[in-house]
Amino acid sequence: MEKREFNIIAETGIHARPATLLVQAASKFNSDINLEYKGKSVNLKSIMGVMSLGVGQGADVTISAEGADEADAIAAITDTMKKEGLAE
């Protein structure tokens, strides 16, 4: 299992557009990928799950992936987070 922690720096947090980009990035991989926030974990391939967390600016989140392509999945999601100015 691979894990990576992020601090959300985007002023609007993870709203509809960035959530869609994260789900699209995660959906390219076979691994199980989850987003954890405030003790709740959701499937990062589910737009409704991601939106239900209500992740705002300043939040600390953890992305975890488990499967054959877990390292590639975490790398791609990290790239998406940074490229979109979502997290550091």
Swiss-Prot record:
What superkingdom heads the lineage? Bacteria
Q: How is its activity regulated?
A: Phosphorylation on Ser-46 inhibits the phosphoryl transfer from enzyme I to HPr.
Q: Which UniProt keywords apply?
A: Cytoplasm, Phosphoprotein, Phosphotransferase system, Sugar transport, Transcription, Transcription regulation, Transport
Q: Where on the chain is Phosphoserine found, per UniProt?
A: 46
Q: Which GO terms describe its biological process?
A: phosphoenolpyruvate-dependent sugar phosphotransferase system
* UniProt cross-references to InterPro entries, sorted A to Z: HPr, HPr-like, HPr-like_sf, PTS_HPr_His_P_site, PTS_HPr_Ser_P_site
A Pfam family per the record: PTS-HPr
Fetch the PANTHER family from UniProt. PHOSPHOCARRIER PROTEIN HPR (PTHR33705), PHOSPHOCARRIER PROTEIN NPR (PTHR33705:SF2)
What is the protein's known function? General (non sugar-specific) component of the phosphoenolpyruvate-dependent sugar phosphotransferase system (sugar PTS). This major carbohydrate active-transport system catalyzes the phosphorylation of incoming sugar substrates concomitantly with their translocation across the cell membrane. The phosphoryl group from phosphoenolpyruvate (PEP) is transferred to the phosphoryl carrier protein HPr by enzyme I. Phospho-HPr then transfers it to the PTS EIIA domain. P-Ser-HPr interacts with the catabolite control protein A (CcpA), forming a complex that binds to DNA at the catabolite response elements cre, operator sites preceding a large number of catabolite-regulated genes. Thus, P-Ser-HPr is a corepressor in carbon catabolite repression (CCR), a mechanism that allows bacteria to coordinate and optimize the utilization of available carbon sources. P-Ser-HPr also plays a role in inducer exclusion, in which it probably interacts with several non-PTS permeases and inhibits their transport activity.
Similarity section? Belongs to the HPr family.
Protein name per its UniProtKB record: Phosphocarrier protein HPr
